Every structure is written in structure tokens, then in C-alpha cells.
């Protein structure tokens, strides 16, 4: 299955701004045309969203289905495409996180990777722990809305 699963807390960022992407995430991304990740500021949370180039293509198709002169389309294009960066893997599976994305997510010297299916998120570890508590509560409250459609 080609999805991003699991969380990895407290991955260190070195002095050059490099962080190692978890091996199982790299395995999913290895099937992509680009050897790296596409990263952009999350529009939902104070974190970085990342994915492969094929998911960016799906986002492009969804955004292009909107009215070309709508405020919504302009906002999505600006945030997702205008702020996105292609980050190539080095020989050790690391990427360099740009300062602008680190600042958006409040990241300094450690990150937490969180699999979200077709994307993964990169968080400041304490911010993720705080978010996880509220997400667990909401998931518990809304658990009956998740139904099998088969």
C-alpha cells in the first residue's frame, strides 16, 4: 500500500538544517518521478504538509476545477503552489527544510513526522502532542460518522 503511516517523534535537525525523512516514507516516495518531497505550509495547522509530486498533480486538478477568477482558487494557488518547495533527498535520505517553512511550523531543532495517508505532516514535537490530544477527543466524539461504505 502506498500511503504514509505512523508517527516519528524527535527527529533531530542538524546545523545545516537537514533532517532525515523516515525510511518507510522514502519507500513510498521512491515510486514517484521526483526523488524527494514537495513541502508547503499547512492551511489547517501550524505544521508543514509534504507529499510526492503525484499528489501535487491531484491538488492542481482540484484547484483548476474552481472558477479561474475566484478568491478561493487564488488563495489555494498562492499557498499551495506559491509556497511549495521541492526538496531533494541527499544520499542519506535527508532534506533541507527552508527557514520559511520551519518558521511557519515553529520548528527549531527537532521535528515530528506524522503519516496522514496520501500526505505526511512535519510538526514541532510539542505542538503535535498538543494537537494530538484535541484530535483524539474529536475522533472519539465523531467516531460514528466513520462508516464502511462496502
From Swiss-Prot:
GO terms for biological process: negative regulation of DNA-templated transcription initiation. GO terms for cellular component: cytoplasm; nucleoid. The lineage of its organism: Bacteria, Pseudomonadati, Pseudomonadota, Alphaproteobacteria, Rickettsiales. GO terms for molecular function: DNA-binding transcription factor activity; transcription cis-regulatory region binding. Keywords: Cytoplasm, DNA-binding, Repeat, Transcription, Transcription regulation. This is Transcriptional regulator MraZ. Belongs to the MraZ family. It comes from the Bacteria. It comes from Rickettsia bellii (strain OSU 85-389). PROSITE patterns: SPOVT_ABRB. It is found in: Cytoplasm, Nucleoid. Residues 8-55, 84-127 form the SpoVT-AbrB domain.
Amino acid at each position: 500500500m502506498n500511503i504514509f503511516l505512523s508517527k516519528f517523534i524527535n527527529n533531530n535537525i542538524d546545523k545545516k538544517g537537514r533532517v532525515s525523512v523516515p525510511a518507510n516514507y522514502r519507500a513510498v516516495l521512491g515510486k514517484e518521478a521526483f526523488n524527494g518531497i514537495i513541502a508547503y505550509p499547512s492551511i489547517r495547522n501550524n505544521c508543514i504538509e509534504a507529499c510526492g509530486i503525484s499528489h501535487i498533480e491531484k491538488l492542481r486538478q482540484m484547484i483548476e476545477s474552481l472558477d479561474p477568477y475566484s478568491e478561493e482558487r487564488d488563495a489555494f494557488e498562492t499557498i499551495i503552489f506559491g509556497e511549495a518547495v521541492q526538496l531533494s533527498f541527499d544520499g542519506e535520505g535527508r532534506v533541507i527544510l527552508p527557514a520559511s517553512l520551519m518558521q511557519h511550523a515553529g520548528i527549531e531543532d527537532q521535528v515530528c513526522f506524522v503519516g496522514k495517508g496520501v500526505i505526511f505532516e512535519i510538526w514541532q514535537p510539542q505542538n503535535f502532542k498538543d494537537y494530538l490530544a484535541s484530535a483524539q477527543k474529536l475522533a472519539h466524539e465523531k467516531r460514528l460518522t466513520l462508516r464502511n461504505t462496502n
